[in-house]
Amino acid sequence: MDKKSARIRRATRARRKLKELGATRLVVHRTPRHIYAQVIAPNGSEVLVAASTVEKAISEQLKYTGNKEAAAAVGKAIAERALEKGVKDVSFDRSGFQYHGRVQALADAAREAGLQF
């Protein structure tokens, strides 16, 4: 089993549990160059809000889009957008990525900006 298939296996297990709970999910995906976040409705088929370092508004503020500062900017942006939509409580879906580094920075920034998980 390679690294990617192991990550996908972990993500599938976590998502199955979150689906049973019927929770609104804050989903994170990372690549070496960018980080993406989406808030997905409990039915799993509707993206309520999204933010990423690909967006011009966020990437213009940053020197580099693949570090913790960029992840924190995305976390703050996703929290502000979710609160505007009326979403306050979410479940954090780390997509099988280790809760460390950029994933943790995004989560901490989202919590500081007002999301609860």
From Swiss-Prot:
Family to which the UniProt record says this protein belongs: Belongs to the universal ribosomal protein uL18 family.
Keyword Ribosomal protein: yes
GO molecular function, one term: 5S rRNA binding
Quaternary structure, from the entry: Part of the 50S ribosomal subunit; part of the 5S rRNA/L5/L18/L25 subcomplex. Contacts the 5S and 23S rRNAs.
Superkingdom per UniProt: Bacteria
UniProt cross-references to InterPro entries, sorted A to Z: Ribosomal_uL18_bac-type (IPR004389), Ribosomal_uL18_bac/euk (IPR005484)
Pfam families according to UniProt: Ribosomal_L18p
Name of encoding gene: rplR
Matching NCBIfam families: L18_bact (TIGR00060)
Keyword tags: Ribonucleoprotein, Ribosomal protein, RNA-binding, rRNA-binding
Role description: This is one of the proteins that bind and probably mediate the attachment of the 5S RNA into the large ribosomal subunit, where it forms part of the central protuberance.
Annotated Gene Ontology cellular component terms: cytosolic large ribosomal subunit
Any one Gene Ontology BP term: translation
Transmembrane segments: none
Keyword field contains Glycoprotein: no
Annotated protein name in UniProt: Large ribosomal subunit protein uL18
